[in-house]
């Protein structure tokens, strides 16, 4: 058996779910192998999905992505009927080669999960910055993490699992980043390798307003700190623990240094100026490389505004650390990014 299915949780996604389903079907997946979880939508999302002839599982009320997946895993026989299970977000459009690449990767011995490469759909200067952030993450970090076996998160918009691995995952609701939670579970339980494949390409809609961007970054960062505390990664000594500490520690150090620029400027204006000039030059170079690689001229044109977003990134990262790790505040819930 070498069958593959797609599971697509959706809540009020009438604007984008048609494009998502069309791309999945155009990539070669049969209608009978697509499962949409209509999580209490009130905008006709389930009806739109049903019009494509796919399977629609309806929740009478909104219970969230993690609980929806948990419920589906408990009541369905998907792990028995399929070899591979792919998770998608309702704003994701897959490339025509996506599922072929995923099947080949999951068919290798010892591979438990595959994460694809996400690209931000062009819309405005903020999505151009997210395009750059994704490019840096996938071009610099993900390949190295894959080779060393320390991928920290398989993104929810492009994650695929062996069915027997999917069946063993706990879709917990005690953290707000179910994709990272499941990734660390695979490492902790030694369920197999997690590999990154850049040809498993998807396009996703990212926040187009600063308000939505800040909310999303706060959720991601808070969730990452929650994962560290849940799995004892601050004091762990495995490879994934060290990678986690390296990434989060880097974020803390850079965040503090970046936000202290006004202080450095008051103490030593010349040193502060050199630091800003060097940082801007590196960011401009990366923007140019990303613009060429992804054929996104908007990434380069919007680069003068990236300093503002980096200030926001650092502020939100440190704020989430303070709330989650220092004050131990419990954060739950999710919000919907405005679609376009």
What name fits each language-model region?
Residues 12-26:
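Short, well-formed alpha-helical segments that are part of the catalytic scaffolds
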Residues 15-19, 43-51, 97:
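Acidic helix N-cap motif at the loop->helix transition within catalytic regions
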Residues 23, 30, 38-46, 61, ...:
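A conserved acidic beta->alpha catalytic loop
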Residues 32-35, 46-75, 116-117:
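Conserved donor nucleotide-binding strand/loop of the catalytic core
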Residues 44, 90-105:
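Acidic donor-binding/catalytic loop of UDP-sugar-dependent glycosyltransferases
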Residues 81-93:
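Short beta-strand-to-loop acidic/aromatic patch adjacent to the donor-nucleotide binding site
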Residues 106, 110-138, 173-176, 180-244, ...:
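Catalytic donor/gating beta->alpha subdomain of glycosyltransferases that bind UDP-sugars
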Residues 250-329:
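Membrane-embedded multi-pass helical conduit in multi-pass membrane proteins
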């Amino acid at each position: 058996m070498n069958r593959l299915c797609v599971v697509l949780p959706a809540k009020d996604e009438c604007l984008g779910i048609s494009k998502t389903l069309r791309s999945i079907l155009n990539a070669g997946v049969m209608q009978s192998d697509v499962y949409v979880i209509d999580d209490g939508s009130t905008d006709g999302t389930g009806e739109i999905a049903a019009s494509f002839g796919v399977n629609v599982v309806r929740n009478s009320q909104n219970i969230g992505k993690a609980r929806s997946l948990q419920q589906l895993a408990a009541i369905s026989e998907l792990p028995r009927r399929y070899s591979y299970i792919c998770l998608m977000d309702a704003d994701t459009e897959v490339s025509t080669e996506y599922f072929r690449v995923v099947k080949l990767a999951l068919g290798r011995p010892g591979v438990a999960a595959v994460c694809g490469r996400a690209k931000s759909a062009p819309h405005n200067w903020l999505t151009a910055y997210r395009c750059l952030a994704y490019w840096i993450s996938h071009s610099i970090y993900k390949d190295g993490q894959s080779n060393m076996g320390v991928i920290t998160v398989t993104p929810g918009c492009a994650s695929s699992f062996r069915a027997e691995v999917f069946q063993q995952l706990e879709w917990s609701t005690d953290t707000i980043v179910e994709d990272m939670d499941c990734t660390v579970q695979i490492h902790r339980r030694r369920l197999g390798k997690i590999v990154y494949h850049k040809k498993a390409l998807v396009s996703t809609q990212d926040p187009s307003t600063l308000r939505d961007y800040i909310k999303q970054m706060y959720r991601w960062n808070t969730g990452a700190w929650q994962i560290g505390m849940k799995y004892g990664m601050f004091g762990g000594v495995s490879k994934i623990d060290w990678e986690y500490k390296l990434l989060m520690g880097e974020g803390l150090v850079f965040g503090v240094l970046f936000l202290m620029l006004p202080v450095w400027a008051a103490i030593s204006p010349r040193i502060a100026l050199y630091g800003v000039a060097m940082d801007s030059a590196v960011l401009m170079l990366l923007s140019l490389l990303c613009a060429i690689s992804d054929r996104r001229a908007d990434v380069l044109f919007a680069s003068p505004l990236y300093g503002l977003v980096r200030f926001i990134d650092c502020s939100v990262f440190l704020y989430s650390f303070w709330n989650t790790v220092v004050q131990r505040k419990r954060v739950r819930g999710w919000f919907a990014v405005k679609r376009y």
